Amino acid sequence: MIKMKLHIKLAEFRMTQKELSEKTGIRQPTISAYCNDSNKHIVKEHLDIFCELFNCNVEDLIEYNKKDGQ
């Protein structure tokens, strides 16, 4: 299972979803979906924007855990 960790970066930077939306041009509902892990897909360009803004690696934004029994 792939999980987004964007909400952790927002907390580290003391930034709101609205502020992130304003800084990146990414719609706030999209950012909310990333933070709530409810997006069905992740836009590669968004990852690039987040990594540049937060000066981090993709691994800091996404986590992969195998499902039980695999």
What are these regions (language model features)?
Residues 45-60:
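DNA major-groove recognition helix of helix-turn-helix/homeodomain DNA-binding modules
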Residues 10, 21, 51:
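The alpha-helix within a helix-turn-helix
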Residues 1-16:
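A short, Lys/Arg-rich alpha-helix, primarily the initiator
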Residues 26-41:
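Recognition helix of helix-turn-helix/homeodomain-like DNA-binding domains
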Residues 20-21, 31-34, 61:
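Conserved hydrophobic/aromatic packing and binding residues within compact polymer-binding modules
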Residues 10, 35, 42, 46, ...:
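DNA major-groove recognition helix of helix-turn-helix
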